[in-house]
């Protein structure tokens, strides 16, 4: 057995902290979204720690062509409902993204915190922005992804499964969206 292990060499499969290995169909997804749930790819969200129900809905929307993003539609085409659920459950068990090393620029954080509080983002996304049920985690998400999503909702390009985000973002100016994304991507308790 030892000889076989030496011949095969070290494993290149990431350890999943005692969790089961990812479903086979999820492998291409992890290449961009991160094997540990934390994306290192520009414009691609981190999925670790997202609520399973939220992930399931998004995967369903991609599969059905109700939300478009290359290559997600092609990757999920033909997935069964059970495969969507397995993928969502696996991703939800991965650790949430780590906050960036820098604590953030107070000149950007303070006004964004007030704007986010005034618009009650924490009501749906929770006070710690960890998300719940069908509402995504925003805390420590990639800033570039958050900004793209916020702009998409505000402009109506990204519709989601209801109009809540488009309505909530209407009073927020386009020029304020970058600071909102910055704040959420640098979120820490007590900030």
What are these regions (language model features)?
Residues 77-99, 144, 170-191:
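C-terminal capping alpha-helices of c-type cytochrome domains
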Residues 26, 41, 92, 116, ...:
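Generic helix-packing signal
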Residues 16-38, 99-127, 142:
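Sequence/structural segment immediately N-terminal to covalent heme-attachment motifs in c-type
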Residues 28, 54, 71-74, 86, ...:
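Extracytoplasmic/secreted proteins, especially bacterial periplasmic and envelope-associated proteins
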Residues 1-11, 22:
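Bacterial N-terminal signal peptides
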Residues 22, 37-68, 73-79, 117, ...:
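Gly/Gly-Pro-rich "capping" loops immediately C-terminal to redox-active cysteine motifs
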Residues 27-30, 57, 89, 114, ...:
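Generic structural signal for well-ordered, non-membrane alpha-helices
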Residues 38-39, 68, 93-107, 122, ...:
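Inter-heme linker and motif-flanking segments adjacent to c-type heme-binding CXXCH motifs
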């Amino acid at each position: 057995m030892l000889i076989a292990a030496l011949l095969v060499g070290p494993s290149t499969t990431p350890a999943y902290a005692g969790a089961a290995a990812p479903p086979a169909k999820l492998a291409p997804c992890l290449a961009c979204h991160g094997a540990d749930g934390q994306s290192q790819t520009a414009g691609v969200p981190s999925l670790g720690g997202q609520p399973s129900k939220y992930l399931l809905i998004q995967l369903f929307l991609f599969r059905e062509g109700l939300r478009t993003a290359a290559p997600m539609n092609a990757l999920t085409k033909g997935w069964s409902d059970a495969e969507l659920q397995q993928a969502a459950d696996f991703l939800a068990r991965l650790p949430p993204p780590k906050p960036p090393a820098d604590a953030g620029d107070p000149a950007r954080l303070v006004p964004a915190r007030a704007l986010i509080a005034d618009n009650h983002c924490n009501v749906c996304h929770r006070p710690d922005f960890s998300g719940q049920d069908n509402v995504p985690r925003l805390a420590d998400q990639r800033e570039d992804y958050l900004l793209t999503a916020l702009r998409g909702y505000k402009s109506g390009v990204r519709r989601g499964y209801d109009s809540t985000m488009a309505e909530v973002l209407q009073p927020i100016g386009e020029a304020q969206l970058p600071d909102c994304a910055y704040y959420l991507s640098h979120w820490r308790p007590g900030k």
